[in-house]
Amino acid sequence: MTTFVDRVVLHLQAGDGGHGCVSIHREKFKPFGGPDGGNGGHGGSVSLVVDPQVHTLLDFHFRPHVKASNGKGGAGSNRDGANGADLVLRVPNGTVVQTTGGTVLADLVGAGTTFEVARGGRGGRGNAALANARRKAPGFAELGEPGDKLDAVLELKSVADIGLVGYPSAGKSSLISVISAAKPKIADYPFTTLVPNLGVVRVDNHTFTVADVPGLIPGAATGKGLGLEFLRHVERCAVLVHVVDTATLETARDPVADIDAIEAELTAYGGLADRPRLVALNKIDVPDGRDLAEIVRPDLEARGFRVFEVSAATREGLKELMFAMGELVAAARAAAPPVEPTRIVIRPKAVDDAGFTVEAAPDGAWVVRGTRPERWIRQTNFDNEEAVGYLADRLARLGVEEKLGKAGAQAGDLVRIGEREFDWHPTLYAEFVPGVRGGDQRLAEKTQRPSAAERLAARKARRQRPGDEPESDELDGDSGE
């Protein structure tokens, strides 16, 4: 049964926002109680948090579908809907979050680091929140926004100070088992280790972690022998230690050729050229092993490697190797920038939601793209004429109509915003559109507000009784003569 998983694809669905409520307050002796529809609750979000007690992505391998709860709808009497519960997924230290296309969204390193990978939908406003001086009793409310929906790839890259690299059966697992408390599986056949093993080493005043990376073979950088999956775990290592088998029975192999082959794979993988290296010539307790180590040692030292002759079985030479590891780790930590103690919650990149663009589509339609217009479209109930009118007013205030006119759009053209398409008829003609202002076909003559003189004349006509003479605008009185 699989016990270690370092790559999974999660199908994430954040919660949808609850719809706003349309309600009018009803109470005895209050005929005009006003709107009291509450707002919808926000949908739950999906977040990833680093937990030091988690070491594998195994749980997500069996449960890849994740969905947060939706927000509740608003209700009358100004009752807001409850927010959906946020869903927190615990991941190992060193988890990289990517899109299916390979774009890195977050690199989670450090206990408590949190990334909001899918944000819950915003709850719709009720008619009480939409009321203003002009619109005293709205007969509509906003719909809740749908939550984010995406597929995310989680990859685990082990966080260790030192990585042990080498051919299969070079003795890497045996070495980590004697210098730390790690208990990896050890056997006398290749590829016994199929998953990275981590161990903590304490020597002198230094404490560091060591990763036993599964064996590499020529072609690993191109994926041969699961090499890409194994090489991923050495990316974060500050120091690399070549573990070389000096007692191999393969006539075509020798320690120098093994190191050259592994170095070629590390170079092909990329990004590891600046890591300091050590060489551990292992199995010198085996007959002819010590002789071969002494033969190749001068050649390796001439290449700039620090070479140690060791035996994981008898523990010979391990103390010197561990001290050298500690020195290199201390130097790497001193050169690294200081780590902030406060864990910051990483959120998706903010956008300028006030901006929008207008472009002509190949099919002749005009496409409006922008965070606000698209969000307003999602929040509008198109079965409610008043809600559609409110949307038109908001788009006009944002400048969408003006920009469409300047781009060359004509009345009746097809306009596409988000997933909605409609025929465009500007609310009012402006100076950039030829014609009389107010000549919109949707505006009837009866909707024009009468002048003050017309209103005064109409009031006098209503007050005049049949048979009475028309009222004079002049005041009657004595002339004083």
UniProtKB/Swiss-Prot annotation:
NCBIfam families: Obg_CgtA, Obg_CgtA_exten, PRK12296.1, PRK12297.1, PRK12299.1, small_GTP. GO terms for biological process: ribosome biogenesis. It comes from Salinispora arenicola (strain CNS-205). An essential GTPase which binds GTP, GDP and possibly (p)ppGpp with moderate affinity, with high nucleotide exchange rates and a fairly low GTP hydrolysis rate. Plays a role in control of the cell cycle, stress response, ribosome biogenesis and in those bacteria that undergo differentiation, in morphogenesis control. This is GTPase Obg. Residues 2-159 form the Obg domain. Transmembrane segments: none annotated. Its main location: cytoplasm. Residues 469-481 have a biased composition (Acidic residues). One of its GO terms (molecular function) is GTP binding. Residues 348-426 form the OCT domain. Monomer. Belongs to the TRAFAC class OBG-HflX-like GTPase superfamily. OBG GTPase family. PANTHER family: DEVELOPMENTALLY REGULATED GTP-BINDING PROTEIN-RELATED, MITOCHONDRIAL RIBOSOME-ASSOCIATED GTPASE 2. It is found in: Cytoplasm. Mg(2+) binds at S173, T193. Its EC number is 3.6.5.-. Residues 440-481 are annotated as: Disordered. GO terms for cellular component: cytoplasm. Keywords: Cytoplasm, GTP-binding, Hydrolase, Magnesium, Metal-binding, Nucleotide-binding.
